[in-house]
């Protein structure tokens, strides 16, 4: 039956927490950016970090760059949903904007490492959809880091050493995507998001919809 006003049926749902992790250079930031550009119901959870800003990064868009003292204040005040130390720098997710967005039905995207993903799953498992992105080879991973041309040789070496330990955590994620083709990897993540949005336990408005559906008596 077509609605009288020709508008689609809207069923309220709680937003989900889409966690994307990978070793540096595996493509998570590119995929996350493409997802944000295409899907307007997804917002990026902007982390705070004590890491120095790269030339290509914009304050408030990529990260909120703060001092170690301010980070410790937020952490100790329970203002962070998760936090981690990565490559000698601290990263964390502010609690308030995430909870407000999800309550309004918006999905939040988290570009974080396995430590942060683990904390989010411990605290808010029902809301989390976690995806780990793998590179096709370690040689390709190294090439991507060099092509990025944003880090020194010493930093690249550290990232490559840490990448093996990060990859060991692939089993802790709900989904695993092999990024040997960027478009195919992106389409795989799109499919995951679409499926997760229609899970029964996320659509709290479904109960009212089904009740009204059963109460409806079409005129013959």
From Swiss-Prot:
One of its GO terms (cellular component) is cytosol. Keywords: ATP-binding, Cytoplasm, Kinase, Nucleotide-binding, Transferase. It catalyses: GMP + ATP = GDP + ADP. Pfam families: Guanylate_kin. ATP binds at residues 22-29. It is found in: Cytoplasm. Essential for recycling GMP and indirectly, cGMP. This is Guanylate kinase.
């Amino acid at each position: 039956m077509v609605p009288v006003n020709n508008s689609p049926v809207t069923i309220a749902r709680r937003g989900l927490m889409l966690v994307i992790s990978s070793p540096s250079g595996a493509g998570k930031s590119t995929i996350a950016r493409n997802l944000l550009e295409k899907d307007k119901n997804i917002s990026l959870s902007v982390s705070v970090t004590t890491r120095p800003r790269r030339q290509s990064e914009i304050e408030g868009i990529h990260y909120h760059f703060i001092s170690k003292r301010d980070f410790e204040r937020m952490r100790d005040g329970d203002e962070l949903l998760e936090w981690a130390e990565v490559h000698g720098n601290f990263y964390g997710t502010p609690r308030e904007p995430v909870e407000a967005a999800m309550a309004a039905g918006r999905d939040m995207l988290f570009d974080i490492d396995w430590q942060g993903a683990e904390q989010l799953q411990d605290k808010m498992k029902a809301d989390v959809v976690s995806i780990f992105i793998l590179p096709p080879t370690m040689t390709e991973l190294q090439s991507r880091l060099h092509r990025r041309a944003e880090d020194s040789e010493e930093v690249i070496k550290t990232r490559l050493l840490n990448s093996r330990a990060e990859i060991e955590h692939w089993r802790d994620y709900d989904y695993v995507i092999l990024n040997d083709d960027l478009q195919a990897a992106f389409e795989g993540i799109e499919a995951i998001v679409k499926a997760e949005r229609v899970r029964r336990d996320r659509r709290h408005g479904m109960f009212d919809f089904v009740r009204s559906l059963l109460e409806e008596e079409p005129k013959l």
